[in-house]
Amino acid sequence: MKTLHKLLLGLFLPAILGPLFGLLVTKTDAESPVAALHKSKSFSKNLDSFRALFVGEDIEEQLAKVQQQTPEVSFASFQQKFPDKASLRNGFQPIDVYNFLSGWKGALENFLAKVVELQKKIKAADDIFPNQKKNPDKKDNPNVLEVLGEYGGDGFFPTLGNNGLNIPDQVFQSFNNFQIENYKISDFKVDIASERDIVQHDKFRFSYVVNIGLELALLVNKRPVYFNFSLDLRTNNFSNQAGFNEIFNAPGNAATNWQFFSKVKVKQLNYDGNDSTHLANTLLQDQFNTLNLNLQKSIYELPLTEMETKFQQEYVELLLAKRREEKRLWDEEQKRIEAERKQKEAELARIQRELKEKAEKDAAVKQAQTNLKTALSSVEGFVKFWTEGEDRIKLGFTKEDNLYTRAGLVKALKISFANYRAWTFYITLLGWKAGSEKLLRKTSWTNLLSDVNFQNAFGLKNTASEEQVGKTSLPGYGYYGIRMSNWLRWALGYYANTHVGSPQNVKATIDGNPSDTTKVWIAPEDFKQGVHIGVGEHFKGKAYKFKFEVSFELEGSIAAHWWTLALRGNIPGYWKGKLQVTHTFDGDVPSWYYGSVHTHAPEYRFTEDNKLLFVPHSIQKITAVGGDSNGVNGLLKSQNLHNLERQSYEVTAPIDLVSYLMFAIAKEPTNNW
């Protein structure tokens, strides 16, 4: 049996941390000295040494004064002393540098506020007509951070670096939607750090340190991320007045082009309910970056107005126009579809009315209808009714119609539905149950695939892969039939040898039948928004009611590779036992949110290509037993696999009930591969 595939520990965290650290990093210079980030001490202990560098200045009094001020006041003092760009070339004193760096707080606040503001404008355009593309291009879904970073150019801080995230392309490829929803600068401090010279131990070297604490509320691939981290930015160090001037008083335009060393400490990283703080810091330990920054445009003269104007012209205005046009075209198409639907509905109503009128006049037809209702209580009765006797002919079936073909089966179901909606709904649930039991009891996925009836019913070729077979049905077969994130599948395959067997002890039940409408029921008319479909508890059970449960066991084992001890997180070192899997389906509508982008609406509808599309509400539960199962159950719980409610648009896609019933009633094939 195939080993499991990749996630969480090796790729998940870099993909999440990348864009966040991207606004802090430009490029890494491995040759730059970063020891000061490890060894520096409080400046106050070496004040005398620092004072000696700047003879004639009351450094102690000046520092005491500015340290009592807010960053805003300190930067205002700097602006008063240096009122224009030309004055920045006049030379800086130690307190000037301190006051200059204090302006970073306001610059960062203004920059992030502008990012959030522009992000809302993009959302406003999407609210006109949501973008349905899985991977929209930059013009349709601009990353505001990335775009403003590009506008800022070299030396601009915050910057986004290469490809918007400053991480390798192979990590970036799955990261296609990144937005800042809110932010908070939880801490900001400018200080002077000191360390002993590594050669002359009686001397000290000094540097300016900026500590920034940031809390960001993000949406990453439409999932919530909370990121709380601190960033240390440190200038090059100096030990004398000449060294200070070389760094901070360079001639010409270089006067405000300074080099910094940065280090990030993650306080909390929470991705879609999963706490990844420890692993994030593990990945970041001893990681330093060099930033060559232009403080004139990063702090002194932040070009936000120009950025906003350019972004408005290149993205917002174009996107608004595009979304309005798309909405107009969509509205026109919906009108056409609605007119066509009404025409077909009227035609179907006419046919049903004629059948009903004929049945009312014909006692034999009435008896056939009665017999049909009885037949709809079991799969065996259904097959017998539509393959034997004259009752089927009286209701519109012909001797040429073949129940074992998709077209014939759909015709039988449509006739049944025209006579008994609820009982037809019930027989398709029984077909779903019988088809699921039949496929889950196959001894292996290859045995299932070799069944030509399975291929015909579900539209598979005999060359299909194990993954395709597992994901074809709901519930799915074997390992690939278990709903989990692609990341977890990767991690289990990468960090361990994992085995999952075929389903055993398969059990399936449907609670009640249409005789009890509290158990099985379907609305007596086609589903409508605001009547059967909508937001919240009021609409639960309005489209249909049922409860279908399938349970089975999967023998499995996990044996982690020896080298993964510090990397594999919640993945246990060794386990062998069984996974008890339960799928529960019902007619609830998720109450947290309803909308075409977020989840499919309830649906029970015949299509022109002979399918019966159905959207159930489902919950998957997995429990490990046998061996030391605590570790596996902990892993399952951390990934919500112990109680996974299927809510997103992708996983609530409609299933075809015809496929299950067709497979359930199929005659045994005469040959297999």
From Swiss-Prot:
One Pfam family it belongs to: DUF237
UniProt-listed InterPro entries: DUF237, DUF240
The family this protein is said to belong to: Belongs to the MG032/MG096/MG288 family.
Name of the protein in question: Uncharacterized protein MPN_036
